[in-house]
Amino acid sequence: MALDICVKVAVGAPDVLGDCPFSQRVLLTLEEKKLPYKTHLINVSDKPQWFLDISPEGKVPVVKLDGKWVADSDVIVGLLEEKYPEPSLKTPPEFASVGSKIFGAFVTFLKSKDANDGSEKALVDELEALENHLKTHSGPFVAGEKITAVDLSLAPKLYHLEVALGHYKNWSVPESLTSVRNYAKALFSRESFENTKAKKEIVVAGWESKVNA
């Protein structure tokens, strides 16, 4: 039986998957575990009442597990791992926080209007930390040869970074960070990612209001 999941719809396109990286993280988990699912696309700017009834805070993603709607991608991914342990996507605890500061640094740099505020260097520092981790472990993924939950969390964030910074700042991950670039390619080329990614123009549109704020 298919699992029900509510995710963000694309702005201005009622039948197209939106650009929420946290929704994609859960979709990637479902795909990698080969679990059947049914998506319900939610307009987060005009939430239907039935959705607010099941998710009073109005946040996506939410997934129905054992008859109850569950919010928060961290919680959902943890419960999916417990309920459907095979194939395992469990990340070894010592690797769970690898790359965890990249998304915040990306958002700060993307919104920055001051080239000298240090936000670009802060992002590069976080990417260099990921580079060093990937180089000192046996890759291609954070925990080694096998993809795990930490990779599925990072993949959508690195995609947003690549698309949004490329569009708004003509910026890309430095060529010197070969392990990070290869890591992103490995993630983006997976069938699970192709099946769940937002179109580039939708990612660009999703960040427009924040860039121009």
From Swiss-Prot:
Q: How does it assemble?
A: Monomer.
Mind telling me what this protein is named? Glutathione S-transferase DHAR2
This entry's comment on induction and repression of expression is:
By ozone. By salicylic acid (SA) (at protein level).
Modification after translation is described as: Spontaneous S-glutathionylation in the presence of oxidized glutathione (GSSG).
Q: Name its species.
A: Arabidopsis thaliana
Would the keyword Transport turn up in this protein's UniProt record?
no
Give residues annotated as binding glutathione.
8, 19, 47, 60, 73, 160, 207
Residues bearing PTM S-glutathionyl cysteine: 6, 20
Assigned protein family: Belongs to the GST superfamily. DHAR family.
Quickly give the catalysed reaction.
RX + glutathione = an S-substituted glutathione + a halide anion + H(+); L-dehydroascorbate + 2 glutathione = glutathione disulfide + L-ascorbate
Q: What is its EC number?
A: 2.5.1.18, 1.8.5.1
User: Where on this chain does L-ascorbate bind?
Assistant: 8, 19, 210
Short motif Glutathione-binding, span: 20-25
Role this protein plays: Displays a dual function. As a soluble protein, exhibits glutathione-dependent thiol transferase and dehydroascorbate (DHA) reductase activities. Exhibits glutathione-dependent thiol transferase and dehydroascorbate (DHA) reductase activities. Key component of the ascorbate recycling system. Involved in the redox homeostasis, especially in scavenging of ROS under oxidative stresses. Plays a role in ozone tolerance.
One GO term under biological process is: acquisition of seed longevity
Q: Which PANTHER family match?
A: GLUTATHIONE S-TRANSFERASE DHAR2-RELATED
Q: Give the disruption phenotype, in one or two sentences.
A: Mutant develops distinct foliar lesions under ozone exposure.
Active site per the UniProt annotation = 20 (nucleophile)
Question: Where does it localize?
Answer: Cytoplasm, Cytosol
| Coiled-coil region | none
